[in-house]
Amino acid sequence: MEYPHTLHINVEKIFGNQEVQITLYSGLTTFVGTNASGKTQTLKKIRDIMRSNIGANKVRYLSSNRIGNMEQYRSKTNQYNYTTDDYTLGDQATKRARLQIETASGDFFAMDERKDVFIKVSERLSVLFNRNIFIRWDAGQMKVFFGKTDSEQEYSVAAEASVLVNVISILAALFDEVVEVLLIDEPEVSLHPQLQSYLLREMKSAAKRYNKTIIISTHSAEMIELNSASELCN
C-alpha cells in the first residue's frame, strides 16, 4: 500500500451520518481515545472497506477478546464443567476460514498451515517464556499444547496464561505474509509494559519487512511512540 492512503468511512453507530476521513501515513497507524469513543467500531468499518478493496483473505482483524471460546475452559461461564484437555480449536473447515476468525484460533491455524510462521513464533516463545508449542490433529480436530523447555510435561492451550495466547496471536498475524492489512483492537490486553514495548517493535518491523499495513487501537502509553510533533496526525 502506498502512503498517504485516505479512507472515507461512515460509522453510523458513533458518528451518525457524518463521514469520517482517516489518512494512513505509514505502515503503522494508532487510534487513541477514551472508552466508548468509537475506536472498535471504526476499526471494524475499516476492516470491511479493506476486505472489499483488496480481498477478504488479505485482511485480518483481531478482537480485543482474542481468548474467544477458550474462556469457558478457564472461567466458570455456565452450569457445565469443561476439561482443558478436551479443548479443540476446530476442524479443517474452520481452518479454511482462519482469516475470518477474529480470535487467537485463527492464528494457531496459521501456524499449522505456514511452517515459517510456526518456526518464528516458536523461537520467540522459547526465548521470552521458556515454552515449547505443539500443534496436533486428533480425530479431525486441531489441538494445541504447551510445555516448558526444560520439561517433557505438556498441557492444553486452554490452561495456559492469557498473556501467551495474546502474544502468540499477534506475532503469528504479524509474521503471516498472506495478511496485507492487520487490525488489532487493544493489543496491550493482559501484557506487561515490557511485552507491550516488545510487540510495538515487532509491529514496526513487520510493517517494513512485509510491507504490511497495521492499524491498532489502544489505551496504553507503551503502544504509542512519538518522536516528533509531526508524527501526531490529525
Where are the regions that the model predicts?
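Switch/communication elements of ASCE P-loop NTPase nucleotide-binding domains
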Residues: 1-51, 139-234
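Short beta-strand
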Residues: 133-138
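Coupling/switch segment of ABC-type P-loop NTPase heads
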Residues: 51-129
